[in-house]
């Protein structure tokens, strides 16, 4: 029955937040930098959350580069766009590195009982500054190859992958966190370029989840992708055959204001085909949904339990300290190589 993912204000769970976590429609929790002061504190916080809701899906944006919420006590994962340049264009080497970095990112989170990182970014590196080096490359074939390797590393640690931001945010200058992003390109450009990483990785069964973009593609559909049944049901579900979990991007972002207040945004996202909606950085917004929204009677067709870790695989990975240590050294090597260029 759980359709909502929310967040916390600080380093522990308040009584009011504990009450929200107990609500039957809350099935997920996303953590941010403000919820982290040290690895030990994070583990304690996760234990506190699990005592309240043992099966809740705990997620974080931990892609690497500038989008890594936990730093002290964690390895600094390089930006995905630095991998191929650091390998001097050697794709075989870059794929090997991407796999090890995916493993490292995932195992460090799983060791703290965090289920999921919303990763990898499958956007192409175009004109979008909010994407930039979060993307593996400007070329679809390179994104596909490197993302697949990164996802395979995540899977070897026991973590599923969530590709974002469908069908592609890389060719939009506006930041959908603070503005309504509009991609004026023709459908042909999107389908021949941006959508290819999603298409290929879905076909290969590599994606357990997808997060759509709060971007309008007016030459294709008048609604932002995350509120569009055309994009989510006709294209993603029917044409591409995706059978995993669709997460909305944060309904608090400016790019979501298209659909009105939180009640309107939640309804539009669920009607379009999202299985779980995210509301971040807005406790009153969460409360308005918990108290005033008419939730569906049926459970999500694609429950977030599909994204719970492979416990047996994680147990094996946690024992592989040599791989973990080697991956840390690799991450540091790539970081140093990029710093030397600056």
UniProtKB/Swiss-Prot annotation:
Do you know which InterPro entries this protein is assigned to? Answer: Beta_hexosaminidase_bac, Glyco_hydro_3_AS, Glyco_hydro_3_N, Glyco_hydro_3_N_sf, Glycoside_hydrolase_SF, NagZ_Beta-hexosaminidase
Q: Name the species this protein comes from.
A: Shewanella sp. (strain MR-7)
From its record, what is one biological process in GO terms?
peptidoglycan biosynthetic process
- The question of whether Cytoplasm is a record keyword is answered with yes
> What keywords appear on the UniProt entry?
Cell cycle, Cell division, Cell shape, Cell wall biogenesis/degradation, Cytoplasm, Glycosidase, Hydrolase, Peptidoglycan synthesis
Site note Important for catalytic activity, residues: 175
Residues recorded as binding substrate, renumbered to this chain, are 61, 69, 134, 164-165
Q: Could you give a GO molecular-function term held by this entry? A: beta-N-acetylhexosaminidase activity
Q: What is this protein called?
A: Beta-hexosaminidase
Family membership: Belongs to the glycosyl hydrolase 3 family. NagZ subfamily.
EC assignment: 3.2.1.52
**What is the catalytic activity of this protein?**
Hydrolysis of terminal non-reducing N-acetyl-D-hexosamine residues in N-acetyl-beta-D-hexosaminides
Which domain of life does this protein belong to? Bacteria
A GO cellular component annotation here is: cytoplasm
């Amino acid at each position: 029955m759980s359709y909502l993912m929310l967040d916390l204000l600080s380093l522990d769970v308040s009584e009011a937040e504990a009450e929200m976590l107990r609500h039957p429609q809350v099935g997920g929790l996303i953590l941010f930098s403000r919820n982290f002061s040290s690895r030990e504190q994070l583990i304690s916080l996760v234990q506190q959350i699990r005592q309240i809701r043992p099966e809740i899906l705990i997620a974080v944006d931990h892609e690497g580069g500038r989008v890594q919420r936990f730093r002290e006590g964690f390895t600094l994962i390089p930006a995905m766009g630095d991998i191929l340049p650091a390998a001097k264009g050697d794709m075989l080497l870059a794929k090997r590195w991407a796999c090890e970095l995916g493993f490292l990112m995932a195992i460090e989170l799983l060791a703290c009982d965090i289920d999921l990182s919303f990763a990898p970014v499958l956007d192409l590196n175009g004109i979008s500054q909010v994407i930039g080096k979060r993307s593996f490359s400007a070329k679809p074939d390179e994104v596909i190859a490197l993302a697949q390797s990164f996802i395979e590393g995540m899977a070897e640690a026991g973590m599923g992958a969530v590709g974002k931001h469908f069908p592609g945010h890389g060719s939009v200058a506006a930041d959908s966190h603070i503005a309504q992003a509009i991609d004026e390109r023709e459908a042909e450009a999107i389908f021949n370029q941006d959508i290819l990483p999603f298409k290929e990785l879905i076909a290969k069964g590599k994606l357990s989840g997808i997060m759509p973009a709060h971007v309008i593609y007016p030459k294709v559909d008048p609604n932002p992708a995350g509120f569009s049944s055309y994009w989510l049901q006709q294209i993603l579900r029917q044409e591409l055959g995706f059978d995993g979990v669709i997460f909305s991007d944060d309904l608090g972002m400016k790019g979501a204001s298209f659909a009105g207040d939180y009640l309107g945004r939640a309804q539009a996202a669920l009607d379009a085909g999202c299985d779980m909606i995210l509301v971040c950085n807005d406790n009153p917004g969460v409360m308005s949904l918990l108290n005033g929204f008419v939730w569906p009677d049926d459970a999500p067709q694609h429950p977030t339990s599909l994204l719970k870790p492979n416990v047996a695989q994680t147990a094996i990975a946690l024992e592989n300290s040599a791989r973990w240590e080697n991956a840390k050294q690799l991450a540091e090597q790539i970081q140093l190589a990029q710093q030397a260029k600056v």
